[in-house]
Structure formats: C-alpha cells, structure tokens
Amino acid sequence: MDIKRTILWVIFSMSLVLLYDNWQRANGHASMFFPSANTQQAAPAGAGGATPQADVPKANATNAAPGTVPAAPQAAAQPVGEKVTVTTDEVRAEIDTAGGILSRLELLNEHEKDGAPVVLLERDVNRTYLARSGLIGGDLPNHTTVFTVAPGARTLAPGQDKLDVVLTAEKNGVKFVKTYTFHKGSYVVDTRFDVTNTGTAAVSPTLYLELARDGSKVEKSQFYSTFTGPAIYTNADKYHKLTFEDIAKGKATVPAATDNGWVAMVQHYFASAWIPQTGKQHSFYAEQIDPNLYRVGIQQPLGQLAPGATVSTDARLFAGPQEERMLEQITPGLELVKDYGWLTILAKPLFWLLEKLHGFLGNWGWSIIGLTVLIKLVFFPLSAASYKSMGKMKDLQPRMTAIRERHKGDPQKMNQEMMALYRTEKVNPLGGCLPIVIQIPVFIALYWVLLSSVEMRGAPWLGWIHDLSVPDPFYILPIVMAVSMFVQTRLNPTPPDPVQAKVMMIMPLVFSFMFFFFPAGLVLYWVVNNILSIAQQWQINRMLGKGKTAAVAKS
C-alpha cells in the first residue's frame, strides 16, 4: 500500500507539471521540457516600424467596393503631430494627432512595483502598443494622416461625467471626424466616426479599427506564464485566441464576417478591445506588420457616399484591467479575456465564491484561506474514503506479501489469489486513488483563478505580504510550505524501497524551490492546503483507529 501511495503521489505531481506544460504550449509559449529549436529572437518594435502607407490595412475582399483598388504602399516621411493628454479619475491618455491614434494609456489606479501607474498602451523605441482607426478604399484619412484637434477641456473636472476630444482630417474629398468620449469611473472610451464626402464623385469608404502591438511579453517567468496575443469573439465562434507565431506563419484563422463581436489584445491581468456598433456588418483581420509587430482589427464598410452625404457610426474602445464583473457589463464575452482555458466551468464558480468571501472578509489573503478551507470540507468525505481504503490495504499487506512469496514464479496464479483476497475482504485496490484523482481538476482550476485574477495584484494579506501577485519577498511562505510537505511525508509510513524513500524526502525541496518564484497568493493556498491536509490526515487516522478499537472490543 505504501509503495502504491508513493507512486500515486509521484504520478499526481507529474500530472500537474505536465498539465501545466501543456497549458503553456496551448497558449503559444515554449515548453519547459522541449523548447522549440526555431524560436526566433525578434527585434524590438520601435516607434517607427513600417513606412506610413505600408502599414495601413488593405480592404478585405468581402468589404471592397466594386472597382475599388487599395492604395499601393508608398514610402513617406513619418507624420509629425501634437500630443494631446487627457486625464480622468481612471486613466491618463495621450492622443497623437498624427493619425488621431491613442498612443499612450496609463491606468492611474493600477501600479507597478515602484508605485508608477501601469502603462498599457505605449509607443517608444522598445515597445509598441496602439489603438488605431482610419478609412480605406482609396487614399483617404487614416492612422498616418495628421488631424486637427478642436480646443476644449483635457482634464475631467470635479462633478463632470464625461469629456470629449474631437479630431478632424480631410483628404481627397473626404472629411473624417473622430470623437473620443472619456467617462468618469470607466475604462471604456466611446468613439464616434463621422465621414462626409466633400468631393464631386461618389466614394465607398471602409472604416477600420485595429490594435497594433509588438510580440514581446510584458512580464516573464521561468515557472509560469499566461497568454499574450490577439483574440477575437463572435456570437457564433465564441472566444478565439490567435498566437503571434501563427499570425507570422500565416496559419491564423479569423471568423467570418458578422454583425457582432469584438477584437482584443490580451496580456496577463490587462487587455484592450475594439467593440464595433452591434448590427453593422464587419469583417476581421490579423496580420504581421513588421518582424515583431502585429495587429488585429475590424473592417466595417460604410456604403457608397454621394457628394455632400455624411455617414456616422460608433464604436467603443476598452483598455484596462481584467476585472471579471466589469467586463461582463461592457459587452457579451469580454470577460473571457480572463482566460481559464478548458477549466472555465470549474474556475468561474471558484472565483465567484472567492469574491463572495472577499465581500465578507474584506481581504483577498483571508479569502484564499477561507476558500481553501471550504474546498477541504467539501472533499473531506472523499479523503476519508481514500484513507479508509488505504488503511484496509495496509491491514492486508502481510497476507498480500505471503501471496507474492508463495507464487512469485507464477504471476497469473498470484493475481488470481490477490483478486480473490480483494473480493473476500471487500477492498478496492484503487479505492485510495480515485478520490485524489477527482480533486485534481479543482486544484488546477483554483491555481488558474489565483494566477489570472487582477484583483490579487497589489492586494496585501498581512505583515510582510503587501502584494499577493508577486513572490514572497522574504521567502517565508515557501519555507513554511517545505516544512509542511516534510511533515506530511513523515506522517506516512516510510516506503520499504530506499529509492522511493529518498524521492519522498526530496520532493518537498524540489516543490519549494519552484514556489520561491510563484506569486504569494498561490503559495499561500498551497501552505494552507498542506496544513489542512496534515490536520485532516490526523483526524481520519484517529477515526480509523477508534473504529478498529471498537471492532476489537466487540470481538
């Protein structure tokens, strides 16, 4: 029984590692064990990138008007514009009139380790992440055209609920007006696009909305990773992730044209998304612009405009943290950027329960502890059944050893007598394994809840833990975890095989080393889980001991 239990825990541990590695590869990251031989070291995406006209998207075949030929790429100097800074209670945004693009966005209530606001959108020599829009279908105003900004307030004043920034450009007989509306207490920027034909011939413009980003990850860890890259959602195809690697190789597929959905750029804890007006037909695209610069976008045909005619359409731009409840209120499916993968069906209820505990306890650290206790209580009957089954197997160990010795030269006869013994004593040799296997998906789902939740970012617990999303600065929790794992191994009978005994002694050290680099919230969960497991094992052994004493007394 001890050998089987040791093997079970080794299999359980390796299953966790392999499942995690599979998750990594499914999210476009290199395997921990089989790194890709052709991994490219992409050059940084600078502020310049492609030539202005070359990086304007071409009209999709389904959007192009009859006889419309996309403008050929032309070498041109980078346009020079003015930077307009807009400040609300949630964001500080920078709009570049060269293209009318959102070129920088700081999240004022989300902070880095040094206390500076998180910068989500940005353009400099090392990083490119932009929200762009424009017109195609001829040489029309686009994100390389210099716009004129209308005068007006740039800071949301006390008592003010919204603030408008209006930009205008005219080119080749088409006037294009963008209006950005920033709201108090919101990460959503409403955008309005007014297109007027000021020329003498009909035009058929197509509006594009895109997010352009370099392929570099914002944060890197050798022991855990989350998805970074574009995503597309439609009511028909649901949530669809695109890896930068697939886009570069031309393997990325996008949903068919529709009148709903959105496009997004996703990274750990944060995301941005263009959400077009519902009910308006549009198509999707995902492309590589430069060796380390990609874009995902939407193209919406605006129809044929006669001279003097105007057409208007709306869209929304979200750029902020992946707060699940907030995302649910913005548009259908946007909460899926907080990616739990194939364990969503378990992870979402766990996060819901964690939120409820936080509403009661007011601290995410104590909420993690509370959730761990509740999970242990739910699985207590299964754990008791597991220990009971293993206890019976332990009692049968002398008889099983005798059978092995008696029939060591006849495996078939040995197995027959073993099965007869199991039937007589009503023991299932796998009875100790199944309860543990059932719990594995829940443990993994909770792991991803804690790793993915931006609510843990900057959330303190007590004393030295000021941020549950970063490693313990003094490594106290990993050390406590190592001690708790060591105690667990000592509570179990020593395996008869010396090699297995050494493995069981080394495992706490190996796991503890890994957890030195894990977020404190995750380590807190494992520490509490281990301590509860020790208490649970002691209680179950006590219950089994009382049962045996009572049985002996009756006999």
Swiss-Prot record:
Any Pfam family the entry gives: YidC_periplas
Compositional bias annotation for Low complexity: 40-54, 64-81
Protein's membrane topology: Multi-pass membrane protein
Region (Disordered): 40-81
Keyword Zinc-finger: no
Domain of life, per lineage: Bacteria
Location(s), subcellular: Cell inner membrane
InterPro entries found in the cross-reference section: Membr_insert_YidC, Membr_insert_YidC_N, YidC/ALB3/OXA1/COX18, YidC/Oxa/ALB_C, YidC_ALB_C, YidC_periplasmic_sf
Keyword annotations: Cell inner membrane, Cell membrane, Chaperone, Membrane, Protein transport, Transmembrane, Transmembrane helix, Transport
One GO term describing the cellular component: plasma membrane
GO MF entries: membrane insertase activity
Membrane-spanning parts: 7-24, 334-354, 360-380, 430-450, 468-488, 503-523
Principal localisation: membrane
Transport as UniProt keyword: yes
Assembly mode: Interacts with the Sec translocase complex via SecD. Specifically interacts with transmembrane segments of nascent integral membrane proteins during membrane integration.
Record-stated family: Belongs to the OXA1/ALB3/YidC family. Type 1 subfamily.
Name this polypeptide is given: Membrane protein insertase YidC
Organism: Cupriavidus metallidurans (strain ATCC 43123 / DSM 2839 / NBRC 102507 / CH34)
Gene: yidC
